[in-house]
């Protein structure tokens, strides 16, 4: 059992083609203590509820972004979420300590073979 409250924010625009992220998200969703949020499912029109999302951040100890890496970046919904929710005065700036002592992790996947990734020198895989 997980003692810390975990917020898993999942962003995959093509879930029907996901071979890695979707199964991981479904498995994590079943773990007690994990709040799993499918951002594309929750906000199909990108109309993100900033107050709700900030409240969720306050209520959790660990925040995980789960997404496939596209062109060295996050999917659009996650970028929009970051831009809106992690605003000045809440996530950073004078007196902003809402995220202080929170653990942040990224669980990301890439869609190419390890050999190709090594050749492109994007990552060093061991």
Where are these regions (language model features)?
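Short glycine-centered, acidic/aromatic-flanked micro-motifs in structured strand/loop junctions
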Residues: 10-13, 39-41, 67
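Helix-loop-strand module that forms the ligand-binding subsite of alpha/beta enzymes
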Residues: 52-126
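Glycine-/small-residue-rich active-site loops that bind phosphorylated ligands and cofactors
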Residues: 15-16, 45, 70-73
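A short, flexible beta-alpha/helix-coil linker loop
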Residues: 13, 42, 111-115
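Generic recognition of short, well-ordered alpha-helical segments
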Residues: 19-23, 48, 76-80
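A short beta-strand-loop structural module common to alpha/beta enzyme folds
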Residues: 33-46
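N-terminal beta1-alpha1 ligand-phosphate binding loop
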Residues: 1-34
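Structural signal for conserved beta-strand scaffold positions within catalytic alpha/beta enzyme cores
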Residues: 8, 36-38, 106
């Amino acid at each position: 059992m997980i003692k810390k409250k975990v917020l898993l924010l999942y962003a995959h625009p093509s879930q029907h083609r996901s071979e890695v992220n979707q199964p991981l998200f479904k498995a994590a969703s079943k773990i007690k203590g994990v709040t799993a949020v499918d951002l594309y499912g929750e906000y199909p029109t990108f109309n993100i509820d900033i107050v709700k999302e900030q409240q969720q951040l306050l209520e959790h100890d660990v925040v995980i972004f789960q997404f496939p890496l596209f062109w060295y970046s996050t999917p659009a919904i996650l970028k929009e979420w970051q831009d809106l929710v992690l605003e000045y005065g809440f996530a950073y700036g004078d007196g902003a300590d809402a995220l202080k002592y929170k653990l942040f992790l990224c669980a990301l996947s890439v869609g190419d073979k390890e050999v190709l990734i090594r050749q492109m020198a994007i990552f060093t895989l061991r």
